[in-house]
Amino acid sequence: MLTRIDNWSSLSGCQIQVRLNGRTVCSGIVGEVSACGTVLWIQPFTGVRRAFDQHDSYEAWAVSAPAR
């Protein structure tokens, strides 16, 4: 089950889907999260590492939940 995560600061190392307008645009493992917690870098299962910014309306949906 996927869980939408609004606070990205705890997502490092998690398996996620990045969505935009309800569609999955990327899936992979979060490598890094910015200090402000609004930008993350994901290593997709296919392709090269990409950055996503919450301010651009991207959503993070966790496959593996972040540690609490």
Language-model features, listed with the residues they occupy:
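Conserved RNA-binding domains used in RNP assembly and mRNA/RNA metabolism
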Residues: M1-R68
